[in-house]
Amino acid sequence: MTNLTLALDAMGGDHGPQVTVPAALQALRLHPKLSLLLVGDETQISPYLSSAEIDVRSRITLVHTTEVVRMDDKPATALRHAKNSSMRLAIEQVRDGMADGCVSAGNTGALMAMAKVLLKMLPGVDRPALVSCLPAINGKPVYLLDLGANIQCDYDTLFQFAVMGSVLSEAVDKIARPKVALLNVGIEECKGNGDVQQAAQLLLHTPQLNYAGFIEGDEIYSGKVDVIVCDGFVGNITLKTSEGIARLLVHQLKQGLAKGFVVRILARLLAPRIQKVLNQMNPDHYNGASLLGLRAVVVKSHGNADEHAYIQAISLAYTEAKRRLPEMIKDRLESILLDINS
């Protein structure tokens, strides 16, 4: 396999190089064929590199800049004025062919605006979609999109999201003919607004997609489908609510295991199994939201991601670049549109 290079916005997120650089080093250890461009303030990045092994350090290139997009910057402002920011320069590395993908924990709106302008959209895609992986009861991953990039979506946009989500599931998890569903207020054919209804009709008449109909919120984690499509308003609320509930359950489980002598003894005996369950429930385990529909790979990490979570985002970008996800989406869309228009 040929080597891959990712550009990292090392200054992005709540913690900057304190998290991004140690995570980058660990990602390089996990992926021997990976090289990284660390974009940011060299004086802040370099101290974290001093103890790295020679093999790891040799696969890092620094791209120096002191400018940073703030988390409260408006997308239009960042696009116009942050010309030398670590976020923009990281994306430009991809645009200029120096990197195969980009990872940032910075301002989501600014990242989307810059990526859309600098990398452009794939033919047949009107808007980029944010998509992330969720856990399911049966252990399979479930992809939910859109997560907030597009508050309102017409039926054609929802259809495009379904295609892109299906290809993502195939590429990353190697699932043959992933089941795709539309998130709705009921499973009956008559339920939902006009755009959801029209998107359903398009999907029903697209044999290249394995459309499974409507799905309700209480079935998101059932594992019955592989891809769930909705507009960004619904998707963002769903994701944030899920993360909050997961943290609540982890907190309550830890509290419950700390009460009572017998319970504490059992907790120690079952510690490895309990920790595995806690890890599976932890939202950081699924960190990394992909911006689908662009001509190159861009992954958005949580702004407050810790080192482990940021490694997940880097690994996701690595997998998507290795599988050539944008090219797969482009080819699938072209094939489907050809069938529709024939």
UniProtKB/Swiss-Prot annotation:
Catalytic activity: a fatty acyl-[ACP] + phosphate = an acyl phosphate + holo-[ACP]
Chief location category: cytoplasm
Documented EC number(s): 2.3.1.274
Top-tier EC class: transferase
Molecular function as annotated in GO: phosphate:acyl-[acyl carrier protein] acyltransferase activity
Subunit comment: Homodimer. Probably interacts with PlsY.
Role of this protein: Catalyzes the reversible formation of acyl-phosphate (acyl-PO(4)) from acyl-[acyl-carrier-protein] (acyl-ACP). This enzyme utilizes acyl-ACP as fatty acyl donor, but not acyl-CoA.
Protein known as: Phosphate acyltransferase
Organism: Shewanella amazonensis (strain ATCC BAA-1098 / SB2B)
Name of the gene this protein is made from: plsX
